[in-house]
Curated annotation (Swiss-Prot):
<comment type="pathway">
    <text>Carbohydrate degradation; pentose phosphate pathway; D-glyceraldehyde 3-phosphate and beta-D-fructose 6-phosphate from D-ribose 5-phosphate and D-xylulose 5-phosphate (non-oxidative stage): step 2/3.</text>
</comment>
<keyword id="KW-0963">Cytoplasm</keyword>
<keyword id="KW-0808">Transferase</keyword>
<keyword id="KW-0570">Pentose shunt</keyword>
<dbReference type="InterPro" id="IPR004730">
    <property type="entry name" value="Transaldolase_1"/>
</dbReference>
<feature type="active site" description="Schiff-base intermediate with substrate">
    <location>
        <position position="132"/>
    </location>
</feature>
<comment type="similarity">
    <text>Belongs to the transaldolase family. Type 1 subfamily.</text>
</comment>
<dbReference type="InterPro" id="IPR001585">
    <property type="entry name" value="TAL/FSA"/>
</dbReference>
<dbReference type="Pfam" id="PF00923">
    <property type="entry name" value="TAL_FSA"/>
</dbReference>
<protein>
    <recommendedName>
        <fullName>Transaldolase</fullName>
        <ecNumber>2.2.1.2</ecNumber>
    </recommendedName>
</protein>
<keyword id="KW-0704">Schiff base</keyword>
<comment type="function">
    <text>Transaldolase is important for the balance of metabolites in the pentose-phosphate pathway.</text>
</comment>
<dbReference type="GO" id="GO:0005975">
    <property type="term" value="P:carbohydrate metabolic process"/>
</dbReference>
<comment type="subunit">
    <text>Homodimer.</text>
</comment>
<dbReference type="InterPro" id="IPR013785">
    <property type="entry name" value="Aldolase_TIM"/>
</dbReference>
<dbReference type="GO" id="GO:0004801">
    <property type="term" value="F:transaldolase activity"/>
</dbReference>
<dbReference type="GO" id="GO:0006098">
    <property type="term" value="P:pentose-phosphate shunt"/>
</dbReference>
Length: 317
């Protein structure tokens, strides 16, 4: 019998959630995703030193201002790692906009344009890139404009149904609802443990998937942020699942039977009228878990972006 990972690949598009090129070569995913934390982690791999040197050398040619050089080097490093990863995945690379821009629609759009330009200068067409944005109201509005320009987006840090609905209504290409971080919050809040079937993160992704399929939304659902293989197996059939190297290895070494859990609705019904900003903000605010986890996620990505920039600044000196 095929291993668990191979069985999953027959039901769901598997994406590698890593900046580690060796892991991508090993597990042969369709797509790859990174974020500021993963770029920081990747930058500490000795083999990546040339990419950092290349990014810094390039940044020095773009500006004499140190702050601008640091920003440019960070963008160039993320894109350079993305370009390398795209040599080993047939599909798309998700590269994230600076989390510190999560509440600024125009600056998010500007950063997306810059990242796409850097990819194009490296010979990568925008059709192979997904721009990752936090699922704030501003991020969703930025994505709506980018999608209308033909730049596809991946809306991340998604913890609530309100965020998922707003993303679909904005015509976003793909959403990344977080599973494990939802589980973390509920375990801490309630003090209880959950099975894969009762996992609040699994239930959230299932609800989003069913809503999208029922109402004919084309937005791709990509479950993310997993704590264990049970969560992953319980979402077999989801459009895509993005999985870190440790769990990919565990799945590859398992022979557990995989059964399709998520299936598209046989009949579709008309979607409700799009949410207003006020409706979105109210519905989102009603979900204490989502409010906590979105804020925490943005803060933590910003912290890791800052750590990366400290490292780049030291090398620029």
């Amino acid at each position: 019998m095929a291993n668990t990972l191979a069985q999953l690949k027959s039901l769901t598009t598997i994406v590698a959630d890593t900046g580690d090129i060796e892991a991508i070569k090993r597990y042969q995913p369709q797509d790859a995703t990174t974020n500021p934390s993963l770029i920081l982690k990747a930058s500490q791999i000795p083999e990546y030193a040339p990419y950092i040197d290349q990014a810094i050398a390039w940044a020095k040619t773009q500006s004499n201002d140190v702050a601008q050089q640091i920003e440019d080097a960070g963008d160039k490093l993320a894109v350079t790692i993305g370009v390398e990863i795209l040599k080993y995945v047939p599909g798309r690379m998700s590269t994230e906009v600076d989390a510190r821009l999560s509440f600024d629609k125009q600056k998010s759009i500007d950063k997306a344009h810059k990242l796409i330009k850097l990819y194009q200068e490296a010979g990568i067409d925008k059709s192979r890139i997904l721009i990752k944005l936090a699922s704030t109201w501003e991020g969703i509005c930025a994505a709506k404009e980018l999608e209308q320009e033909g730049i596809n987006c991946n809306l991340t840090l998604l913890f609530s149904f309100a965020q998922a609905r707003a993303c679909a209504e904005a015509g976003v290409y793909l959403v990344s609802p977080f599973v494990g971080r939802i589980l973390d919050w509920y375990k801490k809040d309630t003090g209880q443990d959950y099975t894969a079937e009762t996992d609040p993160g699994v239930i959230s992704v299932t609800e989003i998937y069913n809503y999208y399929k029922q109402h004919g939304h084309n937005t791709v659902v990509m479950g993310a942020s997993f704590r264990n293989t049970g969560e992953i197996i319980e979402l077999a059939g989801c459009d895509r699942l993005t999985i870190g190297p440790a769990l990919l290895e565990e799945l590859a070494n398992s022979d557990q039977l995989v059964v399709q859990k998520l299936k598209p609705a046989l009949t579709q019904t008309a979607a409700p009228a799009p949410m207003s900003e006020a409706e979105f903000r109210w519905d989102f605010n009603e979900d204490a878990m989502a409010v906590d986890k979105l804020a925490e996620g943005i803060r933590n990505f910003a912290i890791d972006q800052g750590k990366l920039e400290v490292m780049l600044k030291a090398k620029l000196a």
